[in-house]
C-alpha cells in the first residue's frame, strides 16, 4: 500500500471519528444503558447582572417592582428582608420543583436543594423541567433553570439520599451551618413522596430544634396538605404517624410493578402555592401562619386545623422539645393589666337632617319583655298585656260578657243534645 493510500485512509478514519464524536455530543442519551454520564453540563450564563438592592421603582426592567408593591400597600414590612433568608427544599419533584421556582421568583436569599433522583420524560406532566434535561439529576437541572430565572438567588445543591447515615449527617450539618452567614438556616420544606424521607427530615429538625413545613399529595392526585411543625409546640410527624409508619411496614413492599401513583399538575401547584404562601408569611411575619391546611380537589374543600404534640411520641428529641417549650411558657411573665381601648366619639361636622345611629341589637326598656322583634326591626305598637290585674274599659267589659254568654249557650245546647 502506497503512502498516498495510507494518508487517504487515515484522513477518512479521522473524519469518521469526528462525525461519531459530534453525534455523541448532540445525542448524549443514545449511549448504552450501562454507561453513565461522567459530568454534568455547565450552568447557563444568567441573562442579566445581579441586583444589589431591591427597588420599588415601577419600570419594565425591575423584576421586583410587583413584590415591593406589597410593602407600599402595607401588607409586608421591609420585603427586602427576604434576601437574608435561607430555605432548604427536600425533594425537587412535583411539589418541590414548583416551590423552588416560586421562592426563586420571590427573591429568596439562598436555596439548598436535596434530591437523588433524575429527570425523566415521565415527569414532564407536572414538573418545571424540560425534555432536553432528561437524564440529568433533578437538583442540577433545577439549579440551571433557577439561576436563569433569578441570578440573585444563591443555590446550593446536594444530589444524595438523606436517609442514609452519612448523608443524614451532612443534611443535619447544612441545617446547622447552611445559611448565608454560615449559621442555622431559617426553614426546611419537606416535599418528598415517601414516609422514610419524611421521618428523616422530622428526626433532623427535632434534633436541631428547626422549624419546618411538611407537604404531600395523595396517590390519586385529588387531595393534598401542608403542615407547619415547630418542635415542642406543635405535633411532629412522629406524633401522629400514618398507618404505614405506625405499623412498621416497609412501604417499598407496597409498590407493585407496572402500577404508579396518579399525578396532576393542578394539585401539585395548589399544594405548592399554599406551602410557599405559608413560608412567606412565616419568613416576613405577616398574616397568619396556618398550622395545617388540607385540600380536596373533588369538592374544593380546604379544612384548617391545629395538632398538639403527643406526650407519648416515639421521638426522644420531640419529647425533649416539648419539655423545653412547657418550661418556656411557664417562665413567661403574666400581664394581668388589660388595657381597654377608649371608644372614639365620631363627630360629624354637618348633620342637616339630625340623623342619629341607635343600637338595635338589644330591645329597649319600652319594648315587651315577652316579644323580641330582632335586630333591625321594631314593633309598630306595644301589645296589650293581659293578666288578672288588667282593668277593662266599659266597652271592653261588655264585649267580654257578650262573648262569654254565647260560649256558655253553645256549651249548654251541646250538653242537651247529648242527653
Curated annotation (Swiss-Prot):
Protein's UniProt name: Ubiquitin-like modifier-activating enzyme 5
Disrupted-gene phenotype: Reduced egg laying and lifespan. Delayed larval development. Enhanced resistance to pathogens, heat and oxidative stress. Reduced survival in the presence of cadmium. Inactivation of the ufm-1 cascade.
Disordered: annotated span: 18-47
Record flagged with keyword Acyltransferase: no
Similarity comment: Belongs to the ubiquitin-activating E1 family. UBA5 subfamily.
GO MF annotation list: ATP binding; metal ion binding; ubiquitin conjugating enzyme binding; UFM1 activating enzyme activity
Lineage: Eukaryota, Metazoa, Ecdysozoa, Nematoda, Chromadorea
Residues the entry annotates as binding Zn(2+): 236, 239, 313, 318
InterPro entries with a match to the protein in the record: D-isomer_DH_CS1, ThiF/MoeB/HesA, ThiF_NAD_FAD-bd, Ubiquitin-activating_enz
Residues the record marks as active site: 260 (glycyl thioester intermediate)
SUPFAM superfamilies linked to this entry: Activating enzymes of the ubiquitin-like proteins
A biological process term (GO) from this entry: response to endoplasmic reticulum stress
Pfam families: ThiF
Subunit structure: Interacts with ufc-1.
Tissue specificity statement from the Swiss-Prot or TrEMBL entry: Expressed in the intestine.
Superkingdom per UniProt: Eukaryota
Positions that bind ATP: 94, 115, 138, 161, 194
Keyword field: ATP-binding, Metal-binding, Nucleotide-binding, Ubl conjugation pathway, Zinc
Disulfide bonds: none
Stated role: E1-like enzyme which activates ufm-1. Required for interaction between ufm-1 and ufc-1.
Feature: compositional bias, Polar residues: 30-41
A single GO cellular-component term on record: cytosol
